[in-house]
Design a protein with these regions (language model features):
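Short acidic-glycine loop/turn motifs at beta-strand connectors
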Residues: 49-51, 127-128
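Short, conserved catalytic-motif segment at the N-terminal edge
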Residues: 52-67
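Positively charged n-region of N-terminal signal peptides that target proteins for export
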Residues: 1-4
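Hydrophobic h-region of N-terminal signal peptides that target proteins for export
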Residues: 9-18
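Beta-lactamase-like hydrolase cores
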Residues: 20-50
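Soluble periplasmic/extracytoplasmic beta-strand elements of cell-envelope proteins
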Residues: 44-48, 55-57, 133-137
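Active-site beta-strand/loop architecture of penicillin-binding DD-peptidases
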Residues: 68-166
């Protein structure tokens, strides 16, 4: 599995749970990647609007366990922008999420072999005061149809959330 995809999942997990993270077999390498990325991003703009206006910067304190604390306004902005993108940026009716109040971000990574991909979707449910963090990753060959993260993983996320509501 792609180490960078795990790193992104780890960062998202830590950011949206006030530093509480899941453990990984190679956690030392992942933490090293996070610390390296954070040093490179210190003070850099990491969120801007469609007009190019700066919205938030990388202003997190890091520890060996990951992000210790981030500005609350960044957390709120990130959650709101994620929710807005989820509704405005893709066809939620197409992927089965139209009636669910979620904040989600998808990713697609090409594996080492040609035409071989990992698609993922990280979702927080409900978007306001999330109670659940769901991370779905699926391996797909481009010859088998859809391989982008959102359309590949969203039906699984939808089934998980619907089962939580029953």
């Amino acid at each position: 599995m792609n180490r960078y995809l795990l790193t992104v999942a780890f960062i998202l997990s830590a950011l949206f749970t006030n530093g509480q993270t899941i453990s990984h077999d190679n956690v030392q390498q992942i933490l090293s990647d996070i610390l390296t990325a954070q040093k490179a991003l210190q003070g850099a703009v990491i969120l801007s609007d469609m007009k190019g206006n700066d919205i938030a910067s990388a202003d997190c304190r890091m520890t060996k366990r990951g992000p210790k604390a981030c500005k609350q306004d960044f957390m709120n902005i990130a959650a709101e922008k994620s929710k807005q993108f989820s509704y405005d940026g893709c066809r939620l009716d197409y992927v089965g999420l139209e009636s669910l109040d979620i904040a989600a971000k998808g990713a697609t990574v090409r594996a080492n072999r040609k035409r071989h991909y990992w698609g993922s979707l990280t979702a927080y449910y409900p978007a306001e005061n999330p109670q659940y963090r769901i991370f779905v990753i699926m391996e797909q060959n481009i010859y088998n149809g859809t391989y982008y993260g959102v359309p590949l993983c969203a039906p699984v996320v939808a089934r998980i959330i619907k089962s939580l509501n029953n």
